[in-house]
């Protein structure tokens, strides 16, 4: 049996237009659902880079998902292993640990699926569909092959 490759993840065309607006609103402390700003040092430039991300918070634990695959922020976070999460007016340095493919699939199936399913009016599934990420719910193992997940914990790895 030949393993089927995961489809490449691409951001929908609206994302380059939406992200600057989202960043402005989030920087002003406006909450936009489960969104936050992630600031992480560029792996080549060394400069801080900031992008809006979906932040999943459940039972005292936090995760962010590379919905569009191996993007620049994902590669930067892998290299730095730490960043700054800003939610409203609260900024926090966090350590980021990328989940293995198996753990990411388990996260999608047992944590994210009920989380998304609990959103009113089917909003979670609608948003995932608009982002081209419905496979996170429909086929977690396949999604985990090309949608990285990072668990965030307080503090910096250098300070431990």
Where are these regions (language model features)?
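Extreme N-terminal tail/first-helix region
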Residues: 1-28
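A generic local structural motif
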Residues: 23-24, 50-51, 136-138
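Covalent nucleotidyltransferase core used to form phosphodiester bonds in nucleic acids
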Residues: 26-28, 62-75
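A short helix-loop-beta-strand connector motif used in the catalytic cores of GNAT acetyltransferases and
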Residues: 31-35, 146-147
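Short beta-strand segments
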Residues: 33-68
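Short, well-ordered strand-loop elements centered on a beta-strand within folded domains, enriched
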Residues: 64, 159-160
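Short, structured beta-strand-loop surface elements
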Residues: 68-150, 155-158
């Amino acid at each position: 049996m030949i393993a089927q490759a995961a489809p490449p993840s691409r951001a929908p065309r609206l994302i380059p237009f939406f992200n600057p607006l989202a960043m402005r609103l989030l920087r002003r402390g406006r909450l936009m659902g489960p969104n936050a700003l992630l600031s992480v040092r560029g792996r080549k430039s060394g400069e801080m880079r900031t992008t809006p991300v979906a932040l999943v918070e459940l039972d005292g634990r936090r995760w962010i998902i590379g919905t569009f695959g191996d993007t620049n922020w994902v590669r930067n976070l892998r290299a730095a292993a730490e960043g700054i999460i800003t939610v409203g007016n609260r900024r926090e340095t966090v350590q980021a640990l990328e989940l293995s493919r198996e753990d990411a699939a388990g996260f999608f199936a047992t944590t994210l699926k009920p989380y998304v399913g609990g959103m009113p009016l089917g909003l979670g599934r609608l948003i995932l569909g608009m982002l081209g990420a419905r496979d996170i719910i429909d086929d977690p193992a396949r999604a985990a092959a090309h949608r990285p997940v990072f668990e965030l914990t307080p503090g910096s790895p250098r300070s431990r």
